[in-house]
Amino acid sequence: MAFKARVDEVLSRFVAEEADRFAGIDPLLGPVAGQLEEAVTHGKRLRAAFCYWGWRAVGQPDSDALVRAAASMELVHCAAVVHDDLIDDSPLRHGRPTAHVALRDAVRHRPHAPAAARSLAMLVGDLLMALAGQLFATSGLPAAYLARARPLWAVMARELIAGECLEILRTGTGPDTDASLKVIRYKTAKYTVEHPLLIGGALAGAGTRLCEGYSSYGLPLGEAFQLRDDLLGLFGDPARTGKANADDVVGHRPTALLAETWRLAGGDDRERLRTLLGRPGADTEALDDVRELMRALRAPDRIEDMISARVEESLGALDQLNLPPHAAAALTALARSATNRLS
């Protein structure tokens, strides 16, 4: 069975069992339990793959227990997605209503229904994060292996939440490329590539040099992953991305794409941009104006250059590690698939 299919099977079975236990407490909890299962329905499973190859690159063999531990990285992601969609008030994810939108039906006859639905979605994300830790702890790997990796979970949570906080605090402020890259680094890059690799390595008993190499490979690659996401967020096809492509502009979010556009723009162009950013209900024409301005300033090309430079840096670091050929090939392929995509 292909790796992604193995991870999908672990997640669907584990979360279905937990959702049943949760819904068994009271019939009213059924819609909330349904969102637990909905959260794990889609995904590329990149985080699980990086954890898996962080283990395999040390010389450890394939293991069903390791696949379960690696799958827990996806539950961290699912939790982060539910919370991020809630914070950003995003209506769609994978072409389907986000949790805080879908749960409105469960509270439609109650006072302040939208706020109640948002509260339920917040708790869905909280429970998914708890389930991530449970899946990891019950993966079947020896306790000594798990103990080596457990401290990294606290680091991952701290840095992920710091990144989300930084995005909130910087939303609507003056665009700044360095500040945007810091948000990317902590909100996405670390928990997408670096931390899964380090956790896989710690489980396998990786030494200091290899762990440092994982970070040298993982950080620039994680940044490139999110830079690609930012481009797709505005220029991608919503039918492929499954997300509304107005979110970043309407929300005036601190993306590197916006920051580079601002840096390259002159006075008149900045004024045009200022009138469009953060405007509720921006129509298609307004979004097209933003895209046209960005293209005229070649801001997307600048982001493409940043992506290419980071992928090159990442693969250069990988070459220095002298990993087993199968692990090096897998991590090279993951770097390409993470950054050269349409969704």
Please name every model-derived segment.
Residues 52-56, 81, 130-138, 198-202, ...:
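Short glycine/serine- and small hydrophobic-enriched flexible loop segments
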Residues 35-36, 40, 70-76, 153-160, ...:
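Short alpha-helical scaffolding segments that buttress acidic/His motifs in well-ordered protein cores
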Residues 94-125, 174-190, 212, 216, ...:
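Divalent-cation-assisted or electrostatically stabilized phosphate/pyrophosphate-binding catalytic cores
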Residues 24-25, 39-47, 122-130, 137-238:
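All-alpha helical catalytic cores of prenyl diphosphate-utilizing isoprenoid enzymes
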Residues 1-7, 66-72, 146-153, 211-217, ...:
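Hydrophobic packing residues in well-ordered alpha-helices of helical domains and bundles
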